[in-house]
Amino acid sequence: MNLAELTEYTRHLGTRAKTASALMAKAPAASKSQALKALARRLRDNTPALQIDNARDLERARAAGLAAPMVERLQLSPQTLETCAQGCEQLAAMPDIIGAIQGLQQQPSGIRVGRMRVPIGVFCMVYESRPNVTIEAASLSIKSGNACILRGGSEAMASNQALTALVQQALAEAGLPQDAVQLVQTTDRAAVGQLIAMPECVDLIIPRGGKGLIERISREARVPVIKHLDGNCHIYVDAPCDIAMAVQVADNAKTHKYSPCNASESLLVARPVAAEFLPKIGAIYATKGVEMRACPEALAILGAVTGAKLLPATEQDWSEEYLAPIISVKVLDGVDAAIAHINRYSSHHTDAILTMHHAHAQRFLREVDSASVLVNASTRFADGFEYGLGAEIGISTDKLHARGPVGIEGLTSLKYVVLGEGEIRH
């Protein structure tokens, strides 16, 4: 496609999405639920065919020398597809918040003032690798009464095309416009530049991918952006704590999966429990091949662990998102130092405290400036499905509009409604 053809194509996508968004905004709740249930059924019925399409993407990715974490994110396993189907069903079962009026109060003038939940309109999702994002974005768009334009990575084109076809079939079955979910069918990066500069058609941009992609979109977009740049998540092991529980959680937070943005990248340990805790978690990390980049005090303790992969930590390690079997380790005085360290080096994504001290837990929840803060649970729970949102379209570390996992409410806004009986202002 030349530039003129690309401009015409993206404009056509935007115009069709805008038309579809008006229909979706007034779609009955039953129709949206029907579409989501139909999509769940189609995902299950077509799992073998979807895996064939996904295998083509995986083969091309490996041949192109894509990094292992990117290839891992690209995979559509039967479990991944089942999770997507369950997410659709969970969304279908949730109450429809569109059109609901909240906080209606009568004013001295006699008018009643409240706020109504309404769809954003059209959002454009720009993402890399993970084809399951196609279903997460589409299902949330349907439930929230929006239209969406999906621009997945070129490495996942076959998977995304197959998934989008199923979404459009489900929309048609429910009597909803197929243009409510459209996939950008070109891998030309200039298409992204055009979509993020179309405020007359696109109301919101949600990038989900590498830091370079998100920085570029944040810099060039002419419409609002919901984003997070990094996932430098922390586990802080407090004193006192249940050591066995802390070992289990710290293991899960790091090694359950290395590539997600909610995997723990930094392990902070209170000095009173370091000598007992670090050898135990160090042995597990050593067995699983996790490299530990540690402060001098932690290195001295971990040095006795057989097979431990140890390196001295640098200043950069405290703020690094590894997305790999690497973790930074630091021994601290206690909760004050942990909170200060997290607020300085964290990406404000997800951070957790493991403790038996109620006051420390409450301070951590109040004072750590992150989108999700957890007590005695793995950072891997920072996920829309796990939070009961049905699915998530991304995780926002911004402080305005949406923060944390973005589900249905994050794809809506509130407008004021005023009910009167002929009142006039004096």
UniProtKB/Swiss-Prot annotation:
Pfam families: Aldedh (PF00171). The gene is proA. Its main location: cytoplasm. InterPro entries: Ald_DH/histidinol_DH (IPR016161), Ald_DH_C (IPR016163), Ald_DH_N (IPR016162), Aldehyde_DH_dom (IPR015590), Glu-5-SA_DH (IPR012134), GPR_dom (IPR000965). One of its GO terms (biological process) is L-proline biosynthetic process. This is Gamma-glutamyl phosphate reductase. It is an enzyme of class 1 (oxidoreductase). HAMAP family: ProA. It comes from Verminephrobacter eiseniae (strain EF01-2). Catalyzes the NADPH-dependent reduction of L-glutamate 5-phosphate into L-glutamate 5-semialdehyde and phosphate. The product spontaneously undergoes cyclization to form 1-pyrroline-5-carboxylate.
